A protein has these predicted regions:
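Auxiliary alpha/beta "docking" domains used to position bulky ligands
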Residues: 1-171, 351-353, 360, 386
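Iron-sulfur cluster-binding cysteine motifs and their immediate structural context
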Residues: 3, 13, 177-200, 207, ...
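Alpha-helical adaptor scaffolds
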Residues: 252-266, 272-285, 289-303, 315
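Amphipathic alpha-helical scaffolding segments comprising HEAT/armadillo-like alpha-solenoid repeats
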Residues: 269-273, 303-318, 338-349
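Alpha-solenoid repeat junctions
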Residues: 295, 299-302, 333, 337, ...
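Intrinsically disordered, low-complexity segments enriched in serine/proline and basic residues
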Residues: 370, 374-375, 379
């Protein structure tokens, strides 16, 4: 089937993992992801995934790939898991094929249900309990047999009685590169990630505006983030995905053309462009918000295409009635010290002077707040090393 690793798991409750999950929730680290807060006990009881199941087969496959094309002149980076096609239907189909092979082997039909990141289940803890790897400080499953952390994890619940695999005994040791390099300091003690600060949450699951203090730290990430994986020693020799569905040529690739992104007309156009891509998750509004933040960061760098960016952002804002997107567009222009950006920003402020967002836009046009860029590196880190 092309899976890199397959282990067998029991359906016993994950008591210790439940304590970790509750601690994560109690600290408010789930942010606005209310679906993760509902019935937390259910997430550490694998048996609830399929009534009548007796075992779970846990599989992993790498999604890693390197860029194969030159990025557009004005680009935003896409997390590696999303460069190809949506993994949910692809992996579920493979699990069904695998189940059919097992059925031939056992000589009888059996109850089964495939899942991949779409069931109320603490997947990392279950995978670690049965030898797929261990939960690293960035909360991802790590281990030499995985060749790093760039892996999709999936489960096939069955009513077959199978012998479970034992845990893998591994740790990160004293290494904390993921936490040290995280631009927003989202990685906390105890292998807990504060979603309120995580770039992946901010650009994917977050439905609201992005905190202006965090925007410069996104760097060039328009969808997701791989920084904590890129710096991890376990990822020093990643295995390229063997599945063509997850390769960049099958999807949008590693970079997104941000000027083209601003031309998306409506939700219908958005769905057409990204029909089978994971980047549909934040919807049109969220992806445009992300693009405006990255464009602002490009302007802060002094991008070679500054005038094109200013013109595109100004045109976009002039056609918008969504106050969140207008504010993010104004913020982006405010990162630029060019006179053209000042003119464009003033035009936006005048057009929305009577709206609730008017005072915010007016503040951006003030001399004290205009043209004071916050330089960041491509990874999202402030160049002065401060938050």
């Amino acid at each position: 089937m092309g899976f890199h690793n397959i282990v067998i798991g029991s359906l016993d409750p994950m008591t210790e993992a439940g304590k970790t999950y509750t601690d994560w929730l109690d600290k408010g680290y789930a942010a606005s992801m209310d679906y993760l807060k509902r019935d937390p006990q259910k997430r550490v009881e694998p048996a609830q995934a399929l009534a009548g199941s007796r075992s779970v087969i846990i599989a992993s496959v790498s999604y890693y790939s390197e860029p194969v094309a030159v990025p557009p002149p004005v680009a935003g980076r896409v997390a590696r898991y999303a460069v190809g096609l949506d993994y949910h239907p692809t992996i579920r189909a493979k699990l069904r094929e695998y189940a059919a092979l097992i059925e031939e082997e056992v000589g009888r039909p059996f109850l089964r249900k495939p899942y991949t990141d779409d069931v109320a289940l603490y997947e990392q803890a279950l995978s670690a309990r049965h030898g797929l790897g261990f939960v690293g400080k960035n909360s991802l499953i790590l281990g030499p047999q995985l060749s790093g952390s760039y892996n999709f994890i999936a489960e096939l619940f069955v009513d077959l009685e199978l012998e479970p695999d034992v845990p893998y005994q591994g740790t990160c040791g004293k290494c904390f590169r993921c936490g040290d390099k995280c631009p927003t300091v989202a990685i906390k003690d105890g292998a807990l990630v504060d979603s309120n600060l995580c770039i992946s949450f901010l650009t994917i699951e977050n439905k609201e505006g992005i905190d202006p203090n965090l925007r410069p730290l996104l760097g060039e990430w328009v969808f997701g983030c791989d920084i904590c994986q890129e710096v991890c020693p376990y990822n020093s020799k990643p295995v390229t995905t063997p599945w063509p569905e997850f390769r960049p040529e099958s999807g949008i690739g590693h970079y997104m053309d941000l000027l083209d992104l601003l031309t998306i007309k409506d939700d219908v156009d958005f769905r057409r462009r990204f029909e089978k891509s994971p980047v549909r998750r934040p919807k049109r509004r969220g992806l445009l918000r992300n693009g405006l933040v990255v464009l602002g960061n490009h302007l802060a760098y002094g991008h070679i295409e500054t005038e094109k960016i200013v013109s595109a952002v100004a045109t976009f804002a002039a056609e918008q009635d969504d106050s969140m997107l207008v504010e993010h567009a104004a913020w982006a222009l405010n990162q630029c010290g060019e006179s053209s950006a000042r003119v464009a920003l003033q035009s936006i402020a005048d057009a929305h002077a009577g709206a609730s967002i008017g005072p915010t836009l007016a503040r951006y046009t003030e001399e004290s707040s205009f043209g004071v860029p916050k330089p960041v590196s491509s990874s999202g880190e402030r160049k002065d090393g401060a938050l």
